[in-house]
Each structure stands twice: as C-alpha cells, then as structure tokens.
C-alpha cells in the first residue's frame, strides 16, 4: 500500500511593496507522510527539539482544528525549508495541516475553501495561497473574505540569500508603524499597483524597479537586515531584475532572468560568504497529494 503523502512548497511574500498580498511559491518543500493509525498523534521529525512531536505540532493542531473528529495517526515530516527565515515555513505547515484534515477526514474541500481556511489561520493570503496554488499570487483579505488571483512567471529565476541567524516574524513586525500617513499610503500603494501590473504583463525590468521601491515595510526593517542595500546593489550589477526582503526576513529574495540565475548566484556567493546562496525555481504546481490506495488508512 502506498501511504498518503503531501508535499507543500515554500514561499516568499511581499516581493517588495506587495505587503501581505503578493506571494511566490518556491522549490523548497515540506513533506508529510501518513504512516498508520495510533492511539495518539505522533510526529516523527529530525528538526530541533522545540518542534513538538505530538498534537501541539502546528501541522497536527491545524488539522484537528479543521476536522475536530480526526482520528490520530503517526506522521513523518521532512523539510528543506529553513525555519524562521522568511520562506513560509509556518505557512507550509498550516497548508499541510489543512490538507491532512481534508484527506483523512474526507472533507472534499475546494481549492477556494482551502485558501480561505489557510488565510484565516495565517492572517494574510500571500504565503499560504502561493503554497496551495503554486506560481505567483496576488491576494486580498477584506475582513473574513479572501480573493486571490494566480499568474504564471515561468521566465523568472529566483535566488535566495539565507543568513545563519533566525528572525522571528513577530519581532520583524514589531518595528512596523501602527499608523501610516495618508500621502505615504498613496505613494506606497501606487508602487504596489505598478508591481502587480508589471507582473501580469511580464515587464520584468519594471517588476525589478518596483520591488526595490517599497515604503510599507522595508525601510523599517533595514535595522534588522542591514545587508539588504549592499546585496541589492551587487545583484543589480550582476544582472538581476530586483531584490527584496523575503517575507519578514531575514532571507533576501532576488528575481533574475531564468537563464542567468546560476551565474548571478555564483557571483553573489563569492561576495556574501556568510550567507547561504540558493539558486531556486518558482514552483508552478503548488501543493501535491499522493493519495493512491490510501483509502485503507
């Protein structure tokens, strides 16, 4: 019997000025394999000790909130998505938990329902929608209702610079202002509008320009990620379209011409030796489920 397995891609959020709205799925993955029924939930993993191995695990707790009547199982979790680095590790766990409930609880959730539920858990649609749908997503949460549009960006290459230091999302959000002046909001939203239009029309140079002109969050987070300006300068010199914080940071996200991504990554690795330079691709499939013959679980 082939066990039920779920694969969820990582994601980057914001892409500069698309704050809490624009997300892109990336080729790093969280894998969940359902082993067998058990008396209580057990999560097998090789992560740090602080990651729970019982029903307090984020994947399991999410699944149980979605389907409270869910029977416990032993599951095995592996992932190459770095934790607390701005690459959607918690969002991928939430998405995996929803799908775990969907499959084991036979809920038959639609894609729209999964996006809505995931957004309710996460508080914004960018990361979770990208992990569910793949590709590039633009989303909006208006009260309780979420709207998401997905677009293709297959001509783009992706590079991520990942530091050794963690940065908690709550800490990164704590430096943001509680109040945003009206004229600043108008300017910031106009830049975000052009970013989205350029993404839709595949005007990559304009995308690169707009993603480096954010006013919503990056100016306030520079103190937490001081290398961003120098990485941005070098990446542009090496031929990248644009550079931005990946989500809340501390990882840096770079968009490049697809055919130049390896060359640019190698050049950046020679300069920024204290960071892990990853040449990635945009994941266009989103969450995938191997559910062959798992009915007997």
UniProtKB/Swiss-Prot annotation:
Key words, A-Z: Amino-acid biosynthesis, ATP-binding, Cytoplasm, Kinase, Nucleotide-binding, Threonine biosynthesis, Transferase
Show which residues constitute the signal peptide: none
What reaction gets catalysed by this protein?
L-homoserine + ATP = O-phospho-L-homoserine + ADP + H(+)
Which terms does the record give in the GO molecular function aspect? ATP binding; homoserine kinase activity
Q: Name one GO cellular component term.
A: cytoplasm
Enzyme class, first EC level, given as a word: transferase
Pathway stated in the Swiss-Prot or TrEMBL entry: Amino-acid biosynthesis; L-threonine biosynthesis; L-threonine from L-aspartate: step 4/5
Compartments annotated for it: namely: Cytoplasm
Q: Where does ATP bind?
A: 82-92
Q: Which GO terms describe its biological process?
A: threonine biosynthetic process
User: Oxidoreductase: present as a keyword of the record?
Assistant: no
Q: What's the main place this protein lives?
A: cytoplasm
User: EC number(s)?
Assistant: 2.7.1.39
Please explain the role this protein plays, according to its UniProt record.
Catalyzes the ATP-dependent phosphorylation of L-homoserine to L-homoserine phosphate.
Homology family: Belongs to the GHMP kinase family. Homoserine kinase subfamily.
NCBIfam families cross-referenced by the UniProt entry: thrB
Name listed for the protein in its UniProt record: Homoserine kinase
Protein's organism: Bacillus cereus (strain Q1)
């Amino acid at each position: 019997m082939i066990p039920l397995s779920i694969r969820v891609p990582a994601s980057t959020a914001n892409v500069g000025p698309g704050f809490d709205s624009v997300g892109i799925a990336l080729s790093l993955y969280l894998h969940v394999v359902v082993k067998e029924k058990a008396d209580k939930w057990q999560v097998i993993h090789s992560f740090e000790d602080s990651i729970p191995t019982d029903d307090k695990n984020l994947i399991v707790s999410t699944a149980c909130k979605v389907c409270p009547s869910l029977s416990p199982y032993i599951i095995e979790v592996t992932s190459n998505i770095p934790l607390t680095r701005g690459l959607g590790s918690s969002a991928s766990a939430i998405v995996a938990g929803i799908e775990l409930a969907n499959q084991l609880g036979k809920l038959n959730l639609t894609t729209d329902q999964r996006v809505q539920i995931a957004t309710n858990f996460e508080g914004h649609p960018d990361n979770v929608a990208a992990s569910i749908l793949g590709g590039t997503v633009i989303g909006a949460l208006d009260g309780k209702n979420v709207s998401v549009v997905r677009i293709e960006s297959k001509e783009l290459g992706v590079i991520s610079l990942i530091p050794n230091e963690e940065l908690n999302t709550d800490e990164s959000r704590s430096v943001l202002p509680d109040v945003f002046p009206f004229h600043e909001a108008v300017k910031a939203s106009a830049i975000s509008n052009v970013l989205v239009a350029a993404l839709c029309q595949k005007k990559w140079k304009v995308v690169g320009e707009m993603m480096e002109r954010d006013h919503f969050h990056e100016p306030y987070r520079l103190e937490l990620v001081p290398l961003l300006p120098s990485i941005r300068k070098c990446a542009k010199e090496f031929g990248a379209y644009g550079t931005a914080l990946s989500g809340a940071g501390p990882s840096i996200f770079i968009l490049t011409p697809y055919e130049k991504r390896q060359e640019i990554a190698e050049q950046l690795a020679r300069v920024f030796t204290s960071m892990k330079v990853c040449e990635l691709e945009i994941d266009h499939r989103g969450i995938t489920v191997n559910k062959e013959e798992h009915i007997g679980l």
